[in-house]
Amino acid sequence: MSKGQVIQVMGPVVDVKFEGGNLPEIYNALVIEYKSDAEEAPTSQLTLEVAIQLGDDVVRTIAMASTDGVQRGMEVIDTGSPITVPVGTVTLGRVFNVLGNTIDLDEPLPSDIKRNKIHREAPTFDQLATTTEILETGIKVVDLLAPYLKGGKIGLFGGAGVGKTVLIQELIHNIAQEHGGISVFAGVGERTREGNDLYFEMKDSGVIEKTAMVFGQMNEPPGARMRVALTGLTIAEYFRDEEHQDVLLFIDNIFRFTQAGSEVSALLGRMPSAVGYQPTLATEMGQLQERITSTNVGSVTSIQAIYVPADDYTDPAPATTFAHLDATTNLERKLTEQGIYPAVDPLASTSRALSPDIVGEEHYAVATEVQRLLQRYKELQDIIAILGMDELSDEDKQSVSRARRVQFFLSQNFHVAEQFTGQKGSYVPVKETVKGFKDLLAGKYDHIPEDAFRSVGRIEDVLEKAKDMGVEV
């Protein structure tokens, strides 16, 4: 292992000189061990990642933690490889930082644990799956109108308090219970409080045992925030490639990954590109997204929360992300105000998988008819607000009546929210979802009151609820 010396510290950027031409490779992890001035203080270890070879035996590195206490002249050791993180079943139920160190104050991991490098190549063409397969989530509105592809990338849009976290938890629960699948949650540059809340909520709802969590929050240096998504992805890839699992990878928030890359780029002295972003924006995003895919042995399906700066969808950060997405799930505050959960907007949410070739003719026909009906209802709402229902034609009255039933039937109770709602959660297979909506559109249930459709799973549950309301079914 070659050794060098710190010759310059500029915030999170550290320059290191190696004598004798033994320069570390780009992306190699370097380690500085030092003690602070306090006598009782333990030895601190700082990991650096090589970003540029400057010449004259000097490399410029990015720190993965605070550089407080680092001084010129300190010894730096080249580990000889990129950052490595723990992988395998021991990661489940645990919380890690960007370096793969546990931060949940639980038992330390065994020393002989398998570790993988965070910088890896995307799967080659011959390793990729050639079939297109739907990932059944058990959530009606998602499965019917914006289905997820195995190995696909889904963008999750929504403001504060509209149910992003609950939707994420339910997806983790359903994948674990129905598919025996693993989930990895990567908190990238978001609030520490939210990560803490999510951890305890997942503990309470019982899904933590099938989940590995990785955090690089917004108080950490840009190096940690930029690399933590790769740490989460590396853990997910192991379950796909070695355990042959279908893995869900949640990234919250993908915009912060880009933002951290922009900060690092500026610190390294690169010329900025459009709107001040790094010139390598598309390359960095592509390197991350291309590793998220289906292979012959398993899949990594990614659900990425996306913050849109100033609601400008043409901003280079979200625009670059959109190029990689297969589906979008939009959460709408107006639906939460009506008590419709999950508050997924059925008209704004889209999916590349919603085509007759992938989901089948019947599913496609039912989904497009549901969207047409809801679009007509939306167009009529202004007329209803001004003139009332009586001014509508009989055909439009029927459309509105059915659309309201459809809208309520798109809601359902979640397993992870049972402790708050007192209502049992439901998982609805795609076949039953399609059949239920097909019968509903055909007018089979026009006599059932609207309220019977609210927050239920299968169509049988609607009929059961209607009976309890004293309606003949």
From Swiss-Prot:
**What is the reaction catalyzed?**
ATP + H2O + 4 H(+)(in) = ADP + phosphate + 5 H(+)(out)
Where found, per UniProt?
A: Cell membrane
Q: Which GO terms describe its cellular component?
A: plasma membrane; proton-transporting ATP synthase complex
Major enzyme class: translocase
Please report the record's description of how this protein sits within the membrane. Answer: Peripheral membrane protein
Q: What's the superkingdom here?
A: Bacteria
Positions binding ATP in this chain are G158, G159, A160, G161, V162, G163, K164, T165
**Purpose:** Produces ATP from ADP in the presence of a proton gradient across the membrane. The catalytic sites are hosted primarily by the beta subunits.
Q: Assembly and partners?
A: F-type ATPases have 2 components, CF(1) - the catalytic core - and CF(0) - the membrane proton channel. CF(1) has five subunits: alpha(3), beta(3), gamma(1), delta(1), epsilon(1). CF(0) has three main subunits: a(1), b(2) and c(9-12). The alpha and beta chains form an alternating ring which encloses part of the gamma chain. CF(1) is attached to CF(0) by a central stalk formed by the gamma and epsilon chains, while a peripheral stalk is formed by the delta and b chains.
Q: What is this protein called?
A: ATP synthase subunit beta 2
Origin species, per record, is Listeria monocytogenes serovar 1/2a (strain ATCC BAA-679 / EGD-e)
Recorded name of the encoding gene: atpD2
